[in-house]
Regions:
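Metal-dependent amide/peptide-bond hydrolase catalytic core
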Residues: 60, 220-346
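A non-catalytic alpha/beta surface segment that caps or lines the substrate-entry region
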Residues: 37-84
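Phosphate/diphosphate-binding glycine-rich loops and adjacent basic-rich segments that engage nucleotide
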Residues: 132, 177-213, 217-227
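A short glycine/serine-rich beta->alpha loop
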Residues: 114-123, 207-213, 249
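Acidic/histidine-rich catalytic neighborhood of metal-dependent amide-processing enzymes
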Residues: 119-194, 234, 240-245, 252-253, ...
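N-terminal capping segment at the start of a domain
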Residues: 15-39, 301
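Catalytic-core environment of secreted peptidases
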Residues: 78-123
Length: 346
């Protein structure tokens, strides 16, 4: 969930900590200046390790980086607090979509912050990182009573949450999690997100010369094209379906013996999304057989749909925090996946 002031979630009810805007913006400027493309988050992680260590919080880094081919892992810490209150988890990711090297934050007179136009700004998710950092700093600096809280900053979120999938969830104590990874005005929170399923179909035919012996060939691209023509794309009932890439062939005068098709299915009903994936595979198999080809169909569930009950504890705590901060809460639905999909599974 995207929160206006994480200190409202962390603190005892009625306790409001002072947010230092200049410090907050300075931290954002510094974080943005650090290169952090997916799998290359080392600089951001090192800065977070130093900043939290200065607050007396020891972030622990796991070995995820080495496993996924990156240079940084997931960072985690538990901070004790008032045991009469339930602990909460605050989370943000450390990577950004490319181009994420050579970033520079430009502060405009009207209050806007943009990149210089040559890269992304990286507010996704460095704005979330800064919100959490400033909130934690303010709570500890003011000596405010607070609930126990956990921090989890994951690597490689932009590549379908690769980092968080390797985290040891048995370490977590909190049953309430807030993920700072939603765009829009402060006060918005996503309570529902879809399953995201990808598929890959490799059609195999038989190569032959397209002029001298075309009848000896088995046309893999034609088989793939026949399949794609039968797959409805866009909004399909409650789902979205997309064929994203198709590639094959070696030369204009060769009957292609190989063609690869990739795509995805998204939906808020996980079983329905799986059913659609099965239907797509069946279409692929029939089209391949009709052209004398074979097809190898594989799929992967990148994340599973969730829905948070607006009447539940997580949402109610969020509503209370918004009220104390003078914000109008807005519950929204998102069509994107995030770390929260994985937290909801645990």
């Amino acid at each position: 969930m995207m929160l206006g002031n994480p200190s409202e979630i962390m603190g005892n009810e009625g306790v409001v900590c002072m947010i230092r805007e200049e410090r907050l913006l300075g931290a954002f400027r510094e974080l943005v200046s650090i290169d952090n493309p997916t799998l290359r988050e080392r600089g951001v992680c090192d800065l977070l390790l130093r900043r939290y260590a200065a607050l007396g919080i020891r972030l622990q880094e796991d070995g995820t980086g080495a496993v996924i081919g990156g240079n940084a892992g997931n960072l985690y810490a538990f901070v004790p607090g008032d045991e009469a209150l339930a602990p909460v988890l605050l989370s943000a990711h450390t990577d950004a979509v490319s181009p994420a090297c050579g970033k520079r934050a430009v502060f405009h007179p009207d209050g806007r912050i943009t990149s210089d136009g040559t890269t992304v700004l990286g507010a996704d998710d460095l704005a979330g990182q800064c919100a959490i950092l400033e909130a934690v700093t303010s709570v500890l600096e003011d000596g405010a009573p607070h609930r126990p809280f956990e921090l989890l900053f994951d690597a490689a979120e932009e590549s379908y949450c690769t980092g968080i999938q390797r985290f040891d969830f048995s370490r977590l104590r909190a049953k309430l999690a807030y993920v700072f990874d939603l765009s829009g005005p402060v006060g918005g929170a996503a309570y529902q997100a879809p399953s995201i399923l990808s598929f890959r179909a490799v059609f195999t035919g038989r190569a032959a010369h397209a002029a001298f012996s075309p009848e000896e060939g088995r046309h893999a691209i034609r088989a793939a094209a026949q399949a794609v023509a039968q797959i409805p794309c866009g909004r399909v009932g409650e789902l979205t379906v997309n064929v994203g890439t198709i590639a094959g062939g070696t030369a204009d005068n060769i009957v292609p013996d190989r063609c690869t098709v990739t795509g995805e299915v998204r939906g808020f009903d996980h079983p329905l999304a799986l059913q659609k994936l099965g239907e797509i595979e069946a279409v692929m198999q029939r089209a391949a057989a009709a052209e004398g080809c074979t097809v190898e169909f594989t799929s992967e569930v990148f994340c599973q749909a969730y829905r948070v009950d607006p009447a539940g504890e997580a949402a109610q705590l969020f509503f209370g925090a918004c009220a104390r901060a003078g914000l109008e809460p807005r519950m929204t639905v998102t069509y994107g996946g995030s770390d929260n999909n994985h937290y909801c599974l645990h």
